[in-house]
Amino acid sequence: FSIKCFSFDLEAMELGYDKIKERLGELRLKKFGLTVKEQDLIGTLEVALEMTARGFKFGSVDLNKSHSKNFIIDEDQKTLIPPFRAIDGLGDTVANNIIIEREEKEFISIEQFQKRCKVSTTLIEKMRLMGILKNLPESSQLSLFDMM
């Protein structure tokens, strides 16, 4: 499963079969009012629905494991980890920057991650909401309160 698709509903995919089916139903009800992105999403969700029906599970995008374009199998969790490109608005350049920078040195803060990988504030906010950055502090600076 690679990133030949351009639209993903990562939340629905992670929640599984029932949520994917529900989302497909919502899109199909719209029929003629679908955007190009929503039309692409239908195909992606149909594949995801089939995969979940066969026992596959989707995980979350993972800062330390995700590939730029390909889904990765997480043997421990028995899930497919989505690539960075599955995040709406995140392009090839940023996805590749994340991989390169991650291999070079561990990220110690969101601030440092954003600078090193050249990620926009909008994408940082999306990644926060998706829980991708949950293990990183905002800043690299130490606070007196952190030392207590």
Give the residues covered by each predicted segment.
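Noncatalytic, beta-rich nucleic-acid-contacting surfaces in large DNA/RNA-processing enzymes
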Residues: 1-148
